[in-house]
């Protein structure tokens, strides 16, 4: 028990220390976020790439507990994913284009792109259709330009998916994945493992949109997986992941003084997926991140035109409807905690 506690404590403390160090470096270099959501304009300049602090904490724990193969392989996958995320974050330091933010000054609703703006509401003209609509509405005096949003350079969606697929292939080639869901599948496990890797990375990346949301959810999920495993040697990767989330939350909770960026979200998603597949906790592992999974499904349905959100992803829609950021984050944490507690109770992991 003491070993498990020490892994969590070392990971937590080192993540907090490294994150503080990274934050100060980024501040001195004037490297900060450029929000594209109007309501988040007050966060402009907040250092990003805080995932580097989380990564350093995990690597430290891995060096100290290098005899645990589950932890070592998880760290290798995390390092690979973090490098991909870091490249995307570095590209994001340059602005690709500046998009106009407009406000509906008419007396009725207006269609701008896929959105329907009520009187007084604001939106960013992001798509080609939205830009054409704005030009027409401006000429009629129905909207006014109230600001501009810098759009960052980034790795294309196709390139991101390719990189995530390669990370999944790396895991499969390690030979550690063959049994999933209690069944030995051999090579048949490969496509499932790769799809799981891509899904987990994108799920964590999607919910990393509000202060403390991703780190808090993954802290709860990782600790729950460790408890599900009975705090055995297989639980060490989850305890290390939970600790680095806890340490990062010291500076990422509302109001956040640093963001994890794609460096952190890619690393966290890949690390969680790896730990789940290495320890064959697939069913419980997916259940534990039900909130991110549902968020991804909702976004996919929106993009497919099955449902229509005023703003994507779902948590931004809740914010758009008037719910405060802090309440949304607490709601997502609470749902995750309840789902994990029910899962642990139903599996007999807790009384």
UniProtKB/Swiss-Prot annotation:
GO CC terms: plasma membrane
Xref: InterPro entries: Glycosyl_transferase_4, PNAcMuramoyl-5peptid_Trfase, PNAcMuramoyl-5peptid_Trfase_CS
A Gene Ontology molecular function term of the record: metal ion binding
Pfam families named among the record's database cross-references: Glycos_transf_4 (PF00953)
EC number: 2.7.8.13
Transmembrane segments: 2-22, 44-64, 71-91, 158-178, 181-201, 212-232, 235-255, 258-278, 281-301, 328-348
Disulfide bridges in this chain: none
Subcellular location: Cell membrane
Membrane topology: Multi-pass membrane protein
Xref: PROSITE patterns: MRAY_1 (PS01347), MRAY_2 (PS01348)
Keyword flag Cell membrane: yes
Example GO biological process: cell wall organization
Keywords carried by this UniProt record: Cell membrane, Magnesium, Membrane, Metal-binding, Transferase, Transmembrane, Transmembrane helix
Co-factor(s): Mg(2+)
Reactions accelerated catalytically: UDP-N-acetyl-alpha-D-muramoyl-L-alanyl-gamma-D-glutamyl-meso-2,6-diaminopimeloyl-D-alanyl-D-alanine + di-trans,octa-cis-undecaprenyl phosphate = di-trans,octa-cis-undecaprenyl diphospho-N-acetyl-alpha-D-muramoyl-L-alanyl-D-glutamyl-meso-2,6-diaminopimeloyl-D-alanyl-D-alanine + UMP
Enzyme type, top EC level: transferase
Domain of life: Archaea
Record has Transmembrane as a keyword: yes
Family assignment from sequence similarity: Belongs to the glycosyltransferase 4 family. MraY subfamily.
Protein name: Putative phospho-N-acetylmuramoyl-pentapeptide-transferase
């Amino acid at each position: 028990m003491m070993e498990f506690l020490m892994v969590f404590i070392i990971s937590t403390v080192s993540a907090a220390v490294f994150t503080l160090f990274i934050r100060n470096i980024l501040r001195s270099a004037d490297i900060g976020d450029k929000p594209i959501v109007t309501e988040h304009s007050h966060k402009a300049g907040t250092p990003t790439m805080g995932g580097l602090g989380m990564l350093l904490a995990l690597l430290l724990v891995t060096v100290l507990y290098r005899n645990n193969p589950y932890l070592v392989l998880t760290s290798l996958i995390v390092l690979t994913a973090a490098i991909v995320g870091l490249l995307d974050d570095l590209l994001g330091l340059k602005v690709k284009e500046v998009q106009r933010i407009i406000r509906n000054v008419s007396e009725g609703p207006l269609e701008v792109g896929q959105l329907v703006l009520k009187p007084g509401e604001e939106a960013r003209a992001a798509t080609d259709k939205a830009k054409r609509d704005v030009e027409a509405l401006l000429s009629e005096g129905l909207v006014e330009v109230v600001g501009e949003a810098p759009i960052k350079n980034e790795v294309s969606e196709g390139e991101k998916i390719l990189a995530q697929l390669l990370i999944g292939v790396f895991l499969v080639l390690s030979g550690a994945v063959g049994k999933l869901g209690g069944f030995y599948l051999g090579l048949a496990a490969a496509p499932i493992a790769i799809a799981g890797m891509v899904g987990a990375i994108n799920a964590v990346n999607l919910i990393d949109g509000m202060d403390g949301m991703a780190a808090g959810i993954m802290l709860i999920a990782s600790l729950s997986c460790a408890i599900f495993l009975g705090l055995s040697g297989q639980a060490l990767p989850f305890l290390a992941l939970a600790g680095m989330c806890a340490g990062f939350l010291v500076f990422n909770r509302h109001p956040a003084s640093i963001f994890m960026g794609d460096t952190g979200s890619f690393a966290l998603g890949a690390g969680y997926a790896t730990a789940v597949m290495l320890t064959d906790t697939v069913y419980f592992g997916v259940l534990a991140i039900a909130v991110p999974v549902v968020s991804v499904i909702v976004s996919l349905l929106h993009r497919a035109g099955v449902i229509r959100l005023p703003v994507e992803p779902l948590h931004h829609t809740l914010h758009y409807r008037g719910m405060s950021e802090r309440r949304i984050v607490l709601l997502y944490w609470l749902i995750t905690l309840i789902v994990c507690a029910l899962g642990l109770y139903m599996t007999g992991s807790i009384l």
